[in-house]
Amino acid sequence: MTLSLNNLTFIIVTFKSEHIIYECIKSLPKNSKIIVIENSNDQKLKKDLEEKYPEIKVIVQENNGMGSANNTGIRLCETDYAFVINPDVKFHNNTLQEIISFSEKNDDYSILAPISDDVRFPNYKIKNKEIASNNFDYLSVDSVDGFAMLINKNKFKDNIYFDENFFLYLENDDLCLRKK
C-alpha cells in the first residue's frame, strides 16, 4: 500500500505540551488522522484537545518514556504509515506532499524523515548552505533525528518498534540501526 494522507496517522507524544501542540496540529492537513499520547497523566490536555478537535484520539497515560508512548500510538494507529512527530514540529509549505511524492517512487524504506535546517548524524553534520547547494532527493543515513519519523509499518512485520528500555534519547537511533 502506498503512502497517502488517507493511509497515514500522525502520532504526537506530549508531556505537558499544551503551549506548543496547537501550532503543530494547525500545520497538519485538514482531516488528518491524529493520535496524541499525553505522558503526564494530566487530563486537562485531553479535555481541551477533545473539545477543540473531537476527531483526534487522545490517550493519557503514565510516563513510561518516549519510546513506550510512541509504541502505544503506533499500535493504536490503523493505517500502514505512522508519522511520529514531536509537539513542536510545524510542517511548512509542501513538506508533506514532497514526502508523499518521494514515497510513491521509493517505497522500499522502513523509516523516512524530512531534513531539518540543522541535522546531526554520527560524525556527520549537514548545514543549510550544504542542503541548498546540493540537488538530491534523499540521503541514506544511519540514523535520523526523532523529531519527525515516518514509519512504514509494512516493514515491521514483528511489530517491534521503539525499544522501551530507552526512556528518553537514543530510542530513535536504536530503532534506525536495527532497521538498517
Question: Where are the model-predicted features located?
Answer:
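Cell-envelope/extracellular polymer assembly enzymes that use nucleotide-activated donors
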Residues: 7-9, 33, 174
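Short, well-formed alpha-helical segments that are part of the catalytic scaffolds
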Residues: 12-30
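Acidic donor-binding segment of Leloir-type glycosyltransferases
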Residues: 25-60, 72
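Glycine-rich, basic loop-to-helix element that forms the pyrophosphate-binding segment
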Residues: 61-77
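Short aromatic/hydrophobic "clamp" motif used to bind/position activated sugar donors
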Residues: 82
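Conserved donor NDP-sugar-binding/catalytic core segment of glycosyltransferases
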Residues: 89-125
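Short, flexible, basic/aromatic active-site loop/helix in glycosyltransferases
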Residues: 124-148
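A short, conserved alpha-helix in the catalytic core of glycosyltransferases
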Residues: 143, 149-161, 165-180
